[in-house]
Amino acid sequence: MSTAVTAMPDILDPMYWLGANGVFGSAVLPGILIIVFIETGLLFPLLPGESLLFTGGLLSASPAPPVTIGVLAPCVALVAVLGDQTAYFIGRRIGPALFKKEDSRFFKKHYVTESHAFFEKYGKWTIILARFVPIARTFVPVIAGVSYMRYPVFLGFDIVGGVAWGAGVTLAGYFLGSVPFVHMNFQLIILAIVFVSLLPALVSAARVYRARRNAPQSDPDPLVLPE
């Protein structure tokens, strides 16, 4: 594997999970579905998203695919939707307590507050848009649950988002899998996908850091929780 890709944290490298010597090895379909469900349903945002689905699509386009695209694409879309339903009802269950959870290695309070701001800005369309934004796609369904967004509305928009993201990115990898340039530059393409997908989160983190540095030292305003 190239230096560029090995420079990525292992957990964000799709081949760490799906490679011949990866965590899941040849079990590509179960591996992808497990990771998608953990990221979307169990509030663990630090996993590969678009790069994993794109890689799965590429593998399904190989001469001896570990899984066919006709099975992979709908299964990913279905599990993505099921994961969001889980996250929505977690939000309904725990409510505003999520905003008070202390930071840990894999959880930062600003993940929730920024997802809440994203939700407030775009409303119900957030359910679709957040699918393509790492971290936001993990926490926006929870925020929808905390906000008691009407479930039929959430479900409808989530199905659209789940199909667009889960099946769409996977199909993109499948159809581009026959392009020689993609095969020759696979590692760099995956690195680019990871970078582009993380860019919004990096920009947001930079803004938060700059705002904290420039803010006067005073007691922070209390967070207004969704109704």
UniProtKB/Swiss-Prot annotation:
Any one Pfam family match given in the protein's UniProt record, by short name: VTT_dom
InterPro entries listed in its UniProt record: DedA-like, VTT_dom
Ranges that cross the membrane: 27-47, 63-83, 126-146, 153-173, 186-206
Organism domain of life: Bacteria
GO cellular component annotations of the record: plasma membrane
Keywords: Cell membrane, Membrane, Transmembrane, Transmembrane helix
Annotated localization: Cell membrane
Membrane topology field: Multi-pass membrane protein
PANTHER family: INNER MEMBRANE PROTEIN DEDA-RELATED, TRANSMEMBRANE PROTEIN
Family: Belongs to the DedA family.
Protein name (record): Uncharacterized membrane protein MT0380
Biological source species: Mycobacterium tuberculosis (strain CDC 1551 / Oshkosh)
